[in-house]
Amino acid sequence: MSKKFNFFKEAVKNYKTSGTVVPSSKFLAKKMLKGIDFKAIKLVVELGPGNGAITHNILNKLPANSILVCFEINDAFYDELKKINHPQLIVLKASAENIKEEILKLGFNKADCIVSSLPLSIIPNEISDTILSESYAFLKQKGQFIQYQYSLSYYKKLKEVFGNNITLNFEPFNFPPAFVYKCSKN
C-alpha cells in the first residue's frame, strides 16, 4: 500500500512531469510491449518510467545480451528505480531531451525501441518537440517508438514525425484508459 501512496504523492506533487496520479496497469504494459521482437533487440530506452510499472515487464522480456536504459527526472521515482537490482538495467537521472547525448556516453549508437510514458501533450511544446525529434533521430531504421497518452491530441504531432507508420490501440483496463501509439521508423 505504501508504494501506491508514495506514487500518488509524488505524481500529484509533480503532475506536469508525471502526467498521472496512478501507476500504469499491467494491461497497459502488456499492450505497449506486444509485438516487439525482443529476440532481435540490443537496446531499449524507456522515457519516464515512474515507479517501474512498465520497466519490470521490459526486463522480464529482455534477452541476456540486451540493455534497458531508463530516463527519469523525478528524484523519488529515480530512487525507486535504482532499487531494482538487475544487471541489464541502467537508470539515468536525465531529461529525455538529452537521449542521444546520454546514450552515446554509454557507448550505444542507436536504439532498437523507445518506450515512452511521458505526458507529451502537457509538456511544453518546445520540450516535447525536442524529445520527439531526438527520439526519432536516435532510433535504428525499422525501430519502434511506443507512446501512450490519455487522449488523441498528440496523434497529429506523431504523424508529422512518423508519417503513416503509426498503429493506434486503446487500453480500457487502465486508469485512466489510454491510447497506445506504435510508431515505426521506416
Tell me the role of every PLM-derived stretch.
Residues 3-36:
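Class I SAM-dependent methyltransferase Rossmann-like catalytic core
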Residues 41-50:
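Conserved class I S-adenosyl-L-methionine
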Residues 51-64:
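Conserved SAM-binding loop of SAM-dependent methyltransferases across substrates and taxa
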Residues 170-186:
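Core SAM-dependent methyltransferase catalytic element
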